[in-house]
Each structure stands twice: as structure tokens, then as C-alpha cells.
Amino acid sequence: SKDTTWKLIEQLSESHRCVAGLKLAHNVGHQQALWAGLDFVAAGDYDAAVSIDADLQDDVNAIVEMVDYYNQGADVVFGVRRERKTDTFFKKYTAQMFYKLMRTMGGEIVYNHADFRLMSKRSLKALVSFPERNLFLRGMVCMLGYPTASVYYDRKERFAGESKYPC
């Protein structure tokens, strides 16, 4: 990120034990960067981790409900968009086709879930033990077989900047 995000992460991690940051040497792509963070957490002294995009579209208030489900025994709690109001028509259509294709091919994937989720230490360790090099985390997390729950939320408009994803 070219803004002050890293400086904020450093400041927060100094004052809050539950905040940690991982600064990569260069851009490795979304899934690989997320994997690096999850691997970092799996090796650390943490009970669970929440992954959330930094674009401020996912509702941080949903994390409270995620933690509640975790405390009730869920190892993975998916943040699921109620609707795709912030997406273009093309993005909505291609997303719908993607989920249909995944179901047709037998892939287990949570509909309208991106990478906003809570994962327990146990599920993180299982995930990072996969030998995958070409990552599709939304699909891999669903394959773990641990107890799951879903928290539904309304996605917000992007706070600043533009998505680097096509369409």
C-alpha cells in the first residue's frame, strides 16, 4: 500500500497484543499475500485470526458475531455478503456464473463469501499444511472439515481508491 496503512499497523501492534502485521518485500498477489499472513498467524501464539480486506468494505462489526460463533465451537466463521449492491452488473453476473460453475464441478464453496473470515488455530494449521502453490483459499478453507458458521453482513461502498480486480 502506498498510503499510511503500514505505519498504522505498526502503531497498533505496539499498543495492542492482538494486532500483528506482516510486510512483504513486494507485491505477490492477493491470495499469496493472504496465505503469508495466515501462515504467519498459524505459527504464532494466537487462538484465532480474522482476515479482512483493507478496503473498508467488509463490516468490522460482524467480527463480534464471528467471535461469538468461535466461542460456541466453530473453527471457521465465514463473513457472507447479504447482497452484492456495490458490484457492477458485470461483476454480479460473472460471480453468479462462477458459483454455478463451482457447484456443477462439485466444489464446496460458501455463496457470496470472499476472504472475510475468522479461523481457529486448529483450522489455520490444517490449512497451511496443504501443499498448494496455486491458491484458491475460498475453496481450500471449505475443504477443512471443521465446524463452521456464517455471519451475514451488508458490504459498504469502497472508502477510497479503486479495486485492482478487473470489473
Residues covered by each model-derived region:
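Flexible glycine/serine/alanine-rich "lid" or loop that lines and gates the nucleotide-sugar donor pocket
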Residues: 143
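Conserved beta-strand segments of alpha/beta enzyme cores
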Residues: 18-20, 147-149
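Short, conserved SAM-binding/catalytic segment
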Residues: 12-16
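Acceptor/aglycone-binding surface of glycosyltransferases and processive sugar-polymer synthases
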Residues: 19-50, 60-140, 156-167
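Conserved S-adenosyl-L-methionine
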Residues: 152
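Alpha-helical transmission elements in cytosolic ATPase-linked domains
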Residues: 4, 8-11, 36, 65
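A conserved acidic beta->alpha catalytic loop
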Residues: 1-7, 56-57
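Active-site flanking residues adjacent to catalytic metal/cofactor-binding acidic residues
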Residues: 52-54
